[in-house]
Curated annotation (Swiss-Prot):
Keywords: Oxidoreductase, tRNA processing. GO terms for biological process: tRNA modification. The active site is at residue 200. Residues 319-328 have a biased composition (Basic and acidic residues). This is tRNA uridine(34) hydroxylase. It comes from Salmonella paratyphi B (strain ATCC BAA-1250 / SPB7). InterPro entries: Rhodanese-like_dom, Rhodanese-like_dom_sf, Rhodanese_C, TrhO, TRHO_N. The gene is trhO. Coiled coil: none annotated.
């Protein structure tokens, strides 16, 4: 039986990807459908994807599939055909093509089986995830933005909303999607008679959120087909005004796609206009934050003087300090609370 996981080091894989001459296309897709055997499906898909030199991150669960990948451009159509014929439920599936793409978004293929393709925290047997809101296409989105009876709800995390969002969209202040769902219901009670329009990056979160809102008694619920990515693509193709302001955060090496010229965020260290996310270079921190080029130079890519000083220590001393810390100091921590405490940023929810 072939090896169904990667055995090559990340550094070697990244160097190999960067040396590739053929351009790649970054693609995301999802589908809520019943998978009887997620592990078996994962293993079969792994072989298909590996044969096509696909890199990226793929989650499978009994409820469906969620993928962010990159594919060699010469193999995109073959990939599409093999995906569509793999399972009847995937035939004709919409593939979201990246709006800005340097082809360097991923360098390894990771496929995992999870309890859910989106961690929602829902434990209600009466919840019907298939009873979703109506889809909105690009022209309909723009019309809704001009409708005084419509309320746009951003179902992404705080660090995504900070760098870009639709005009006048409401942010649901929470660190995770599972925390957002009950808060969205609570916050929107006063807008129960309004038209609720939900959106996210590619559609997977807002689709489930729309079903959750309907489950909680909201009757006029829509969600944007294909999320921000598909909206911007269709609006541009159709010559429509793009009403999303700023940058669309993405979960790969690019960390963002420019949608409009406006920069609506600020450097977390000096306050200068900036919407470029980075992870603190201190391996004992890796905080996700916004840093301008000047502060990146001043702090050597770190989020604080403390991390900058620690990064300058001998590697052995850095490892010793990391080993002595509590497990709660999570790598790649994106929580608003940790961001606020490390960089002294006021919490807008307070």
């Amino acid at each position: 039986m072939p090896v169904l996981h990667n055995r090559i080091s990340n550094d070697e894989l990244k160097a190999k990807m960067l040396a590739e001459s053929e351009p790649r296309t970054t693609i995301s897709f999802y589908k809520y459908f019943t998978i009887a055997s997620p592990q078996q499906t994962r293993d079969a898909l792994y072989q298909v994807f590996t044969a096509l030199d696909v890199f990226g991150r793929v989650y499978l669960a009994y409820e469906g599939i969620n993928a962010q990948i990159s594919v060699p451009q010469s193999k995109v159509e073959t990939f599409r055909q093999q995906l569509y014929t793999f399972d009847p439920a995937l035939d004709g599936l919409r593939l979201n093509i990246a709006l800005e793409d340097d082809g360097k978004s991923f360098w390894v293929l990771r496929m995992k089986v999870r309890d859910r393709i989106v961690a929602d925290g829902i434990d209600d047997p009466s919840f019907d995830a298939s009873n979703v809101g109506d889809y909105l296409k690009a022209a309909d989105v723009n019309a809704m933005l001009d409708d005084p009876d419509a309320v746009f709800i951003d179902m992404r995390n705080h660090y995504e909303y900070e760098v870009g969002h639709f005009e006048n969209a409401l942010e649901i202040p929470a660190d995770t999607f599972r925390e957002q769902l009950p808060k969205a219901v609570e916050m929107l009670r006063e807008h129960a008679d309004k038209k609720i329009v939900m959106y996210c990056t590619g559609g997977i979160r807002c689709e489930k959120a729309s079903a959750w809102m309907k489950h909680n008694g909201f009757n006029k619920v829509w969600h944007i087909e294909g999320g921000i990515i598909e909206y911007a693509r269709r609006a541009r193709a159709q010559g429509l005004p793009v009403r999303f302001i700023g940058k669309n955060f993405v979960f790969d090496e690019r960390m963002g796609e420019r949608i409009s010229d406006e920069v609506i965020a600020h450097c977390h260290q000096c306050g200068a206009p900036c919407d470029s996310h980075t992870n603190c270079k201190n391996d004992g921190c890796h905080l996700l934050f916004i840093q301008c080029p000047q502060c990146a130079s001043k702090f050597n890519g770190c989020c604080s003087e403390q991390c900058c000083e620690e990064l300058a220590l001998p590697e052995e001393e850095q490892r010793r300090r990391r080993a002595g810390r509590e497990n709660g100091n999570k790598i790649f921590n994106k929580s608003r609370g940790r961001l606020n405490s490390k960089l002294s940023i006021p919490d807008p929810a307070e």
